[in-house]
């Protein structure tokens, strides 16, 4: 069974209290993973990390921001099939719809 974690400040972390919730495939009703059951303290930590990161982003040049966004797009494209499978499983969408309507527009 898969175990998902929060991604905060460049690191994968569990909920601060260690609690998890089941992740269920909506097409079968079967649990296929667990995810952190994040609370207010987890949200506050993520918000602080995002605000701190924004300082660097805000002060970067448009060229640097553009290059960073292109690198993100390249990474999404390189792992496209993985994202398609995850999104289909998470939402219960057919893979074909996810492949044509969800992931490509992100890139």
What annotation goes with each model-predicted range?
Residues 1-34, 67, 71:
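Terminal low-complexity tails and localization/encapsulation signals of metabolic enzymes
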Residues 32-107:
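Glycine-rich loop-to-alpha-helix module at the N-terminal edge of alpha/beta enzyme cores
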């Amino acid at each position: 069974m898969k175990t998902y974690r929060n991604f905060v400040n460049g690191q994968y972390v569990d909920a601060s209290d260690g609690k998890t919730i089941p992740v269920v495939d909506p097409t079968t009703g079967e649990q296929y993973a667990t995810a952190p059951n994040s609370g207010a303290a987890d949200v506050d930590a993520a918000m602080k990390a995002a605000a701190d990161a924004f300082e660097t982003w805000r002060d970067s040049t448009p060229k640097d921001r553009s290059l960073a966004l292109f690198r993100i797009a390249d990474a999404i494209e390189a792992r496209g099939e993985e994202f398609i499978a995850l999104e289909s499983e998470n939402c219960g969408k057919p893979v074909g719809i996810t492949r044509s309507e969800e992931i490509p527009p992100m890139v």
